[in-house]
Amino acid sequence: MFTRNLAGFAVVLALGACASAPADGPNLGRQVAPDEIAAWDTSIMPDGAGLPSGSGTAGQGASIYAQKCVACHGENGKGGTALALDAKGPIISINAAEKTIGNFWPYATTLFDYIRRAMPWQQPKTLTSDEVYALTAYVLVLNRVIGENDAMNATTLPRVRMPNRDGFILRFPDKM
């Protein structure tokens, strides 16, 4: 019994010594600067929290679209190799219509966030905030959600009411 207690005491003593020893390691990495974190923290909420400064109109977006988007999405958002960007009509049921931005997406801020993170497909995250606002405005005009002269920015974009905003059912409303 004494031997067993002695062995247990030795293990506890060894673990205690290891816990107080300085951590010697490969010293990899470095402290991340706040501006580096800010560059990666690009989340945009449906209410517009996180939207950057800048602005754009559909007219500006049309010229950017012609340069950077038409190859995949086609003229006026139709006929390209990628999904169509304009609404073909309201969604009556899950299978009744093709899901597009105008008839399915619940928030315009989600469109901005998606364009900013994922487009253009061959060079994602290369658009400026002004270009993203302009392209967002252009796509919203294609879907007849906003007027051609409406400017999109951090104030106006969250106010855009998407046609299908209320078309989603909360699965767990008590968790909201």
Describe each model-derived feature in a short phrase.
Residues 78-116, 120:
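Gly/Gly-Pro-rich "capping" loops immediately C-terminal to redox-active cysteine motifs
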Residues 27-64, 120-123:
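Electrostatic cytochrome c docking/interface patches
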Residues 18-20:
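N-terminal Sec signal peptide cleavage junction
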Residues 30, 59-67, 78-79, 104-108, ...:
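Sequence context surrounding c-type heme c attachment/ligation sites in exported
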Residues 61, 65-75, 135-139:
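The canonical Cys-X-X-Cys-His
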Residues 122-176:
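Flexible coil segments in periplasmic/lumen-exposed cytochrome c-class electron-transfer proteins
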Residues 36, 57, 107, 111, ...:
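Stable alpha-helical elements in mature extracytoplasmic
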